[in-house]
Amino acid sequence: MEFSLQIVVRHLEHSDALEARVRKDVAKLLSSHPRMVSCRVTVEELGKHHRQGRQFQVRIDVRTPGKEIVSRRDHHEDVYVALREAFDAMRRQLKDAAKLARGEVKTHPAPRRAEVTRER
């Protein structure tokens, strides 16, 4: 199966180190979830906050057969921390989706309903 990766950087100067980090994290995701069809990683600088300085947002869109999963992490001062948190969230979401597909999700019994009987 062919895999496509798209890296988008907005309002921020493109960095080879940032791209290498994204590629490394995507390769890690791909090794644990080989059924991924495509991945789009968007790194965006939201602007400057008057107290915290620069703010970064990372959004990851992953397509698997029959499903699209989105992970988005807002407002972090360090772009690499925002990347780490977004990829950690995506890893958890992919793991949960795989469990759901295998049917390993815990099911709860239907709640009991009480019947009121009146004796006359």
Regions found by a protein language model. Give the residues of each.
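N-terminal, polar/charged subdomain of small-to-medium soluble alpha/beta proteins
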Residues: 1-120
